[in-house]
Regions:
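N-terminal glycine/serine-rich phosphate-binding loop of ATP-dependent small-molecule kinases
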Residues: 1-95
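Glycine-rich phosphate-binding loop and adjoining helix at the ATP-binding site
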Residues: 56, 84-117
Length: 117
């Protein structure tokens, strides 16, 4: 059996996992959506644990036992500047992920810009 490639696209709205062969032909695709949270006006957050579970779920649905031994490569893309702070002792997120669309830092950016930065 030929070598297989997994591609994971963890985007703003979902985790997408794709399985390709060596000729870059897509063999399977899985899409698992996640919630977006808006705790305040202009704020956008994701549950980092949900995203982690969705990545695990998408890979499990994508690969079958018969192809697991033929995995050759893994490619990952993610959501631009989305940030998650993890507890170094527990491995758990301290708070929700701050999504790249979130505007909570806009005032700080505007102040820096006005100061010449």
């Amino acid at each position: 059996m030929e070598n297989l490639i997994i591609a994971i696209d963890q985007s703003t709205s979902a985790t997408k996992a794709m399985l390709f062969n060596e000729r870059c032909e897509m063999l399977r695709r899985v899409n698992v959506t996640h919630e977006q949270y808006y705790p305040k006006s202009g704020w956008v957050e994701h549950d980092a644990e949900e995203i982690y579970r969705n990545v695990q779920k998408s890979i499990a649905e994508l690969i079958k036992e018969e192809v697991a031994d033929n995995m050759y490569s893994l490619a990952i893309t993610n959501q631009r500047e989305t940030v998650v702070v993890w507890n170094k002792h527990t491995g758990k997120p301290i708070c929700n992920a701050v999504v790249w669309q979130c505007m909570r830092g806009a005032d700080i950016c505007n102040e820096l810009k006005a100061s010449g930065y």
